[in-house]
């Protein structure tokens, strides 16, 4: 048994992961690609890119592919509204956390009517040399 895998995170770490996600939510609604770039993990030199976005309709592997996806959706209507009271940060180890947030997303292509959908957003945050960063984004539609 790997005892380290069951180590708890500090209350400060839990707050930092939560704050990172809320920063992401604000950046998405503001269509701020620079902040989105800052919250995604960067691989250490010589290591594989840990960033991915896996949805029912599509997948994106790597930071640049994920950022390109957000650049595309930011061209239209995009609002990202997590239910902060229902958010959960679940430690998976001292340097990894699962973040869960029921979220309302309003989306629409530029010049087209937008629609609102409910998702159960699941993300993995990892501790990096630069602090906590997002490595995986998995939005699960509720319907």
Per-region residue spans from a language model:
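Short, low-complexity N-terminal intrinsically disordered segments enriched in polar/charged residues
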Residues: 1-43
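A solvent-exposed, acidic/Ser-Thr-rich amphipathic alpha-helical stretch
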Residues: 14-15, 33-93, 117
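Short, cysteine-centered beta-strand-loop-beta hairpins and adjacent loop/turn segments enriched
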Residues: 77, 105-115
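A short hydrophobic beta-strand element
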Residues: 95-105
